[in-house]
Design a protein with these regions (language model features):
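Non-heme Fe(II) oxygenase metal-center motifs and adjacent flexible, charged/small-residue loops
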Residues: 1-210
Length: 210
């Protein structure tokens, strides 16, 4: 089966994460917010993309926004850890061990092409946790991922390829917003997002700081 996007160099084969996080770099957004990025963290990312694209129970949600119904420009699917496909549960375990929190929910967004997107927002987990960690594994086509401070100011942009890992930590959900904008020639992409529901003190993740 041919993939609907340019295959990545290490995209074939069974999904396997880099347990050493050898490519991880930390970007300090401000004194209390940070982002970790680990390029090519997951090998076999194209295999996992195909599996999820063909078997997950994708749904297109409709939401009430500013007094009108809006159809989300993407497909979504969610699991609790322990009920998701085995590769996703395995990644949850690795990330939990690394960051010292119990990731217990998984949410996937399927951007079918460059017209699908997600607007600027902070994850709702910020309403229940002081310093939530949100981990994202990117599959499929390359897309831009942006962050901007809520009070205004310069933002930060990252380009995520299939197999890349991005983790937002500190007060990033409270003080920053993030987005995946439309892309004129964007191909299909799936993002796998891991969240935790209980407060925990995350261990500092070793890595080179920008």
């Amino acid at each position: 089966m041919s993939l609907p996007f340019q295959p990545s160099l290490f995209g074939a084969g069974n999904p396997a994460a880099d347990k050493m996080y050898s490519t991880l770099r930390r970007c300090q957004l401000d004194d209390e917010s940070w982002v970790d990025v680990a390029p090519a963290w997951l090998s076999g990312a194209d295999t996992l993309f195909e599996e999820l694209a063909g078997s997950a129970a994708w749904d297109q949600r409709e939401r009430w926004i500013h007094g009108r119904h809006v159809i989300e420009p993407r497909l979504t699917c969610g699991w609790t850890v322990g009920t998701s496909p085995p590769p996703l549960d395995d990644l949850a375990t690795l990330l939990s061990q690394r960051y010292g929190v119990a990731f217990d929910s998984i949410w996937a967004n399927y951007y079918r092409d460059g017209r699908d997107s997600v607007a600027w927002h902070g994850d709702r987990v910020r309403f229940s946790l002081q310093r939530p960690l949100v981990a994202i594994v990117s599959l499929g086509s390359r897309r831009r991922f942006g962050l901007r401070p809520r009070g205004g100011g310069a933002g930060r942009w990252f380009t995520l390829d299939g197999g890349d890992l991005l983790v937002m930590g500190g007060r990033s959900q409270h003080d920053w917003e993030h987005t995946v904008p439309k892309a004129a020639h964007g191909g299909p992409r799936i993002s796998i997002t891991y969240r935790h529901s209980r407060e925990s003190v995350a261990r500092p993740a070793p890595g080179t700081t920008d």
